[in-house]
Amino acid sequence: MAITPTALHDALTQAAEALRSQRIEGLFDTTPDRTSGYRCEAAGLTLDYSKHLLHDSARQTLLTVSDTQALPAAFASLIGGEIVNTSEHRPALHTLLRGTASDQHPEKSKEIEETLSRMAALVESIHSGASTGDTDKRFTDVVNLGIGGSDLGPRLVCEALHTHAAPLKAHFVANIDPDDLDGTLAPLNPETTLFVICSKSLSTEETLSNAERAIGWLQAGGIQGQALGAHLIAVTTQVAKAERWHIPPERCFPLWDWVGGRYSLWSAIGLSIALSLGWQSFQRLLDGAHSLDMHTESASPTHNMPMVMALLELWQTHYLGANTHVVLPYAQKLAHLPDFLQQLTMESNGKRVSPTGELLEHDTAPVLWGSAGTIGQHSYYQLLHQGTRSFSADIILPLRSGEGDRDARRALAAHALAQSRAPMVGRPAEQARQLGVERGFDESASQQFEMPGNHSHSLLIMDAVTPESLGALIAAYEHKTYFLAVLLGINPFDQWGVELGKVIAGHMQTVLSGDDSNVEMDAATLAAAEAWRAANAD
């Protein structure tokens, strides 16, 4: 385990072992101020972690870890621009995109301000009708072409903050499967459709393929040559490559190597957000994230929301044995949050070696999954309540949910709070026996109604889903991910594991096209390739 000194690790191990025989609800009896004491508040968010299997002594030991592992200093290194991405010898300054520690980076801050100014001007020009398509019709739809960080973040934000009065309707295409693009474009009009092509190198296979096919769709709709540029925006470092699609330099926006893809929605990657929701909403999103940055920089470990979130995951994963973490947002607006967090956490912390190449002896990131409530209640909550797997969870509840049927929103909140209680209390054996007898089962068969409970989870309350609170929520998870990486002794800013599949896919292209029948590959894969070739022989 990366935790030092060893005595601290041993103390946590012993505390976890002692707590296994205790009930979470019993801790409320022994800790009178538990409800108010086990919470953090920041930027419109409240983290209530009182329903974790954790007592004061164990919590204090965990908080000591934040000092011994120098988490505050690690955050100062992050926002200060030190080389935290050691394998690629780069800083990770996504916080600078929202104005955090801008005084420490005057040159980079100037570049960001210039880019934001250009973005705002283009958005205003399109919304006002000054910039139109080739036939002088105003744009009605914007299609974001990207994958990974250039898709998941903007998609989450646009879905969460969408209103029927949005200036442009946003669409997202990431999959190389042509059904994704074709299905998206089917109801759209080429004359009123704008594309944002997001690729740092303009060589990402999925994005390049979709961009070429999208341009073909525009051409089939009568938009040719230089006129294509009116319908295209590129977020890339490769301006010369963009020009071959007739995208003028003023419609190309930069990406910097000190911003990783999964942290990039705050950059020009967020153009689809601004185009769909308006520049003010995008700026408010940045402001919310900045507020959370300021909280993270200044709050003590006891009250530091992302720091506590990271320590809780360390506690659950490494000391209480939780091997998955489920995120359950009780807001349809946040349905894409688990997808976004999967990339953020598992691509960042799904590592097995240290930055110096040492094989780690401890687990790193847990598997993260989830969906919007109450959908999950009718699919996998059965496993959560009565399965054999150990897990931890975040239940997310906005207090104010906007317009709509008040009774339905009350019911949604009731389900959220019920699922915040049920995993903790469960259904004891005696209650299960009584229920079984009432339903005509004998005592032995009545065990199927028992639910052990005692599952730890956090309740994360949002005042409402607004640009500010959503920006803060995303930033909180970003910083949690970074702090956990520091605790685990790994680099969260590279992703070498993504490359192997890409390399093999390149070989498979030659096999599937019939250009290389002598490639060395296992028989099962070659048999599947031959089946595909036979099915697509025409």
Regions found by a protein language model. Give the residues of each.
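Active-site phosphate/pyrophosphate-binding segments
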Residues: 219-405, 426, 502-509, 515-538
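C-terminal accessory domains/tails appended to large, multi-domain proteins
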Residues: 452-455, 462-488, 493, 500, ...
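Glycine-rich phosphate-binding loops that contact phosphosugars or nucleotide phosphates
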Residues: 121-129, 135-299, 507
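Helicase-primase coupling helices
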Residues: 363, 367-464
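Extended, charge-enriched "interface" segments that sit outside catalytic cores
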Residues: 3-8, 15-28, 32-135, 140, ...
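Conserved active-site and cofactor/substrate-binding residues in soluble primary-metabolism enzymes
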Residues: 7, 33, 53, 57, ...
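Short glycine-rich or small-residue beta-strand-to-loop segments that form or flank ligand, phosphate
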Residues: 140-146, 195-201, 324-331, 367-368, ...
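Flexible, glycine-rich loop/tail regions that form catalytic "lids" or insertion modules at the edges
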Residues: 1-73, 307-319, 334, 341-342, ...
